[in-house]
């Protein structure tokens, strides 16, 4: 179980530096900050096998751990006000990956894609949360739920949270 927790910590570190390929986890192998937290970064192939076993429950566990890490970072910062930016991005795929579909894809018109929705804290330059959606998903879909989840996980009496989104997120629910 310690190995699996180490893989999760490795993935969180990858999220925080914005990796786009598991191969880039190697950039963390000799990082002093990663070593300070006693995280042994495994080979990308090992992490890939680990991720292949994920289901909804383990994905939710990963999200919960990420919120705990972000909350610790936020607490250490002693900020009393933060801005959370919510946005989406299209990830082009080749072939017929599960969940990918044709949608708004400016990179390759007509190709199947995923539509990733994510939230970052502007002041800390840190990833807060996010999830993968089908390529044909409307920009604002899931944003209200994401805002509720963020507030439920990080809100405190001495913290003011401002959410910032572009006009694609205009929706009565938000």
Predicted regions: what they are:
Residues 1-9, 141:
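Basic, short loop/linker segments at the boundary and entry of helix-turn-helix/winged-helix-like folds
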Residues 6-18:
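Short, hydrophobic/amphipathic alpha-helical patches that form generic packing surfaces
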Residues 10-11, 25, 43, 47, ...:
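Short, conserved catalytic/metal-binding motifs centered on acidic residues
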Residues 17-30:
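Short, charged amphipathic recognition helices of the HTH superfamily
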Residues 30-49:
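Short, basic interhelical loop/turn and adjoining N-cap
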Residues 38, 131-142, 162-169:
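Alpha-helix capping and helix-loop boundary segments enriched in small/acidic/polar residues
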Residues 48-118:
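Active-site-proximal, Lys/Arg-enriched surface segment
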Residues 106-156:
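Electropositive, glycine- and tryptophan-enriched low-complexity nucleic-acid-binding patches
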């Amino acid at each position: 179980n310690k190995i699996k927790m180490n893989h999760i910590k490795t993935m969180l570190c990858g999220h925080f530096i914005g990796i786009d390929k598991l191969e880039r986890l190697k950039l963390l192998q000799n990082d002093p900050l990663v070593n300070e937290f006693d995280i042994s970064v495994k080979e990308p192939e090992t992490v890939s096998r680990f991720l292949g076993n994920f289901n909804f429950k383990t994905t939710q566990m990963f999200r919960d751990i990420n919120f705990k890490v972000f909350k610790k970072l936020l607490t250490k910062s002693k900020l009393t006000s933060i801005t959370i930016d919510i946005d989406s991005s299209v990830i082009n795929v080749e072939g017929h990956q599960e969940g990918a579909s044709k949608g708004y894809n400016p990179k390759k018109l007509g190709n199947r894609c995923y539509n990733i929705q994510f939230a970052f804290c502007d002041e800390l330059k840190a990833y807060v949360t996010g999830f993968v959606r089908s390529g044909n998903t409307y920009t604002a879909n899931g944003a209200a739920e994401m805002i509720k989840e963020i507030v439920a996980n990080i809100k405190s009496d001495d913290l003011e949270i401002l959410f910032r989104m572009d006009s694609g997120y205009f929706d009565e629910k938000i």
